[in-house]
């Protein structure tokens, strides 16, 4: 692999590994990065962005391995983790019901879109996410109090995060805060739901993702996924520790504003 190719793979992995856990769209930022840095067409960049979820999926399975194991055990045998397991199942089903048709429609739109139009769409979606986070009231519920209504609301919202620019973690956090969950609990639950969501996203685009990965080369994809895995582990741990101190909404609004203004400024020059 040439040096420039290695550098771009590392960049894509770092962007995916960081943005997956912030309420800014990992798919949107990864898509934008690959379009602008590598000159990849929008639809191909979108395929690769979804495929990079493999690295973050491995990271969340490692970090949340014990909670997932306890969930499966209690779903089968009964126990305190059974409620969380049912919450995850209902939320994931609702995500699939919304996400699959939205993604199929979106794919055709993005295939015909220009790079600047995609970037501006991403910016607008990021601003919406930021506004949602700013208006969401924070409460005192914890993970032991999740119910079916929470699962349906969060799952349906999560389904729209297949759109580049709509943040999965930002959407789930905002909805959980709106449902009056504590901020730290909202972050934990958002990460907990990430495993099933990423597994579905990776499976959704497996064929197209492999085709796009073949164009980039095996070494490029392995490097990008590996970097994404390592960076994801670090970011998850940091965010779980300082969740109550971060103002995610300002990050979304700032990046969304940049994504909207840069193409407009370029046209004026």
From Swiss-Prot:
Keywords: Cell membrane, Hydrolase, Membrane, Transmembrane, Transmembrane helix. Its EC number is 3.6.1.27. InterPro entries: UppP. One of its GO terms (molecular function) is undecaprenyl-diphosphatase activity. Its main location: membrane. It catalyses: di-trans,octa-cis-undecaprenyl diphosphate + H2O = di-trans,octa-cis-undecaprenyl phosphate + phosphate + H(+). It is found in: Cell membrane. It is a multi-pass membrane protein. GO terms for cellular component: plasma membrane. It comes from the Archaea. The keyword Zinc-finger does not apply. Pfam families: BacA. The chain crosses the membrane at residues 4-24, 50-70, 86-106, 113-133, 146-166, 186-206, 220-240, 246-266. Catalyzes the dephosphorylation of undecaprenyl diphosphate (UPP). HAMAP family: Undec_diphosphatase. PANTHER family: UNDECAPRENYL-DIPHOSPHATASE. Belongs to the UppP family. This is Undecaprenyl-diphosphatase.
